[in-house]
UniProtKB/Swiss-Prot annotation:
Protein name in UniProt: Fluoride-specific ion channel FluC 2
Role of this protein: Fluoride-specific ion channel. Important for reducing fluoride concentration in the cell, thus reducing its toxicity.
Gene (UniProt): fluC2
UniProt activity-regulation remark: Na(+) is not transported, but it plays an essential structural role and its presence is essential for fluoride channel function.
Annotated membrane topology: Multi-pass membrane protein
Amino acid sequence: MANPTQPLPNQWNEMWLVAFGAVPGALVRWQVQNDLLVNVIGAAILGLVVGLPFRPSRQLLLGVGFCGSLTTFSSWMVECSTLISQGAWLSALGLIGLTMGLGLGVAALGFLIGWQFRPSGLGR
C-alpha cells in the first residue's frame, strides 16, 4: 500500500506542471499589483482554458499553475476588510460585487470563446 503522505510518481509530473505555470503567473501578479485587474484577467484566462479542448496537463499548467498564482482571493479580502474597517461599507460591497460580476462574466465569455474551438464530437 502506498504511503498517503508520499506523492505517487505521476503526481510529481502534475506538481511540476503546476509549479512551472505558477512562476510566470506570480511574476505577472507581482508586476501588476492591482487585485481587480489580475482577478478579472485570471478569470478570463481560466474560462478560456476550461473551454478549450486542452489535455489535463495543459489545464494544470495554465489553469491551476498560472491562473492560480496570478489571481488572489486573500489580497482581495484584505482590501475589502480594510474598507470595512474604515467605515466604507458601500465601497467594500461595491468592490465585492464588481469583482464577482466581472469575474463571472469574463470567465463565461472565455469559456464560450474556447468552446467554439472544440471539435464537434468533443462535447459540442
